[in-house]
UniProtKB/Swiss-Prot annotation:
Job of this protein: Catalyzes the hydrolytic deamination of adenosine and 2-deoxyadenosine.
Record's protein name: Adenosine deaminase
Domain of life: Bacteria
NCBIfam families: aden_deam
Family per similarity comment: Belongs to the metallo-dependent hydrolases superfamily. Adenosine and AMP deaminases family. Adenosine deaminase subfamily.
Record text on cofactor binding: Binds 1 zinc ion per subunit.
Length: 335
């Protein structure tokens, strides 16, 4: 089965986890940014997982170097453009790129300039390639609550202009949603859609709380609902889509293999799962690679993929016009 030629949708892709290694090197040389190595093969070890990762926290260490080269308007625009260029080459027709603006203020940019630069890169790529993109703003859970309010407030002016949603990301502690009730209440009032990283690192109850306390419309990962019957039931009853990222989950040691990943069980039980990369560079993956692995190890069929694709269309925060366009590609999903 040729998964490369199939139309695809990406709903969970971090900008700072999906840079070209060549671009990191190029910007570092141009801007005099120190790197542990200027040899591409050696640098890859610092920004990609090489089967040496034992946890989500270790996985997140791979973002340190990419963020060093994402501190100017020019670089942010370039990196966003290149991401859409890369996924368009993988036949992705729609992508929701996510990033945390406050990770890019080291050289004096303000939040508005940061968001604007990424949107410019997305829009430039849309003009050249057969792809549409939107932006999800991330609030870092390892920063204080006022910083989350700041992102919500300052990003609101871009809603309807490319920004579609708010997210909570970074390391996952038990019962984190309770701290963010007021932040997400404000986000909803501003008009953001809501997706929350939860149930990625062993705490299924976080998914329950993200939906009940934070009004999450989608869940990033959500795989540990398998260990929380109440969360599983709620996700199924409310048709809450899960942004599943299998290879990333293996890298963070949430699961030992594709065969033991609960994705196929969720799909067969009617859970609205979607397949995503999480971080193309960190996990050295693409949507095509994800599908090939699921086909090889879990028996993913073309019929299964059609369900996944339509799940992603409906789960997306795209406009009704874009959703209609995405549905038109269903006829191309054949074995």
């Amino acid at each position: 089965m040729n998964f490369k030629k199939l139309p695809k949708i990406e709903l969970h892709c971090h900008l700072d986890g999906s840079l070209r290694v060549d671009t990191i090197l190029d910007i570092a040389k141009k801007d005099n940014i120190p790197l542990p190595s200027y040899n591409k093969k050696e640098l890859i070890n610092y920004v990609s997982i090489m089967d040496d990762c034992n946890s989500l926290d270790e996985y997140l260490n791979k973002f340190f170097i990419p963020n060093k080269v994402m501190q100017t308007k020019e670089n942010l625009k370039r990196i966003a453009f290149e991401l859409l260029e890369d996924v368009a080459a993988d036949n992705v027709k729609y992508i929701e790129v996510r990033f945390a603006p406050l990770l890019h203020v080291e050289k004096g940019l303000n939040i508005e300039e940061i968001i604007e630069s990424v949107l410019e890169g997305i829009k430039e790529a849309e003009k050249l390639y057969d792809i549409k993109g939107n932006l999800i703003l991330g609030c870092m859970r390892n920063m204080d609550i006022p910083s989350a309010f700041e992102v919500v407030k300052k990003g609101a002016k871009f809603i309807g202009k490319g920004v579609v949603a708010i997210d909570l990301c970074a390391g996952e502690e038990p019962h984190f949603p309770g701290k963010y009730i007021e932040v997400l209440k404000l986000a909803k009032e501003c008009g953001y859609r809501i997706t929350i990283h939860a149930g990625e690192a062993g705490v299924g109850e976080n998914v329950l709380e993200a939906i009940n306390l934070l009004n999450a419309e989608r869940i990033g990962h959500g795989i540990y609902i398998k260990d929380c019957a109440e969360a599983y039931k709620l996700v199924k009853e409310k048709n809450i889509p899960l942004e599943v990222c299998p290879t990333s989950n293996l890298h963070t040691k949430a699961f030992e293999s594709y065969e033991t990943h609960p994705f196929m069980d969720f799909l067969k039980d009617g859970i609205k799962v979607t397949i995503n990369t999480d971080n193309m560079t960190v996990s050295n993956t693409t949507i095509t690679k994800e599908l090939e692995m699921l086909n090889k190890f879990c028996g993913l069929s073309i019929g299964d993929y059609k369900i996944l694709y339509l799940n992603a269309v409906e789960a997306s925060f795209a406009s009704s016009e874009t959703k209609k366009m995405l549905k038109s590609y269903v006829k191309e999903i054949t074995g």
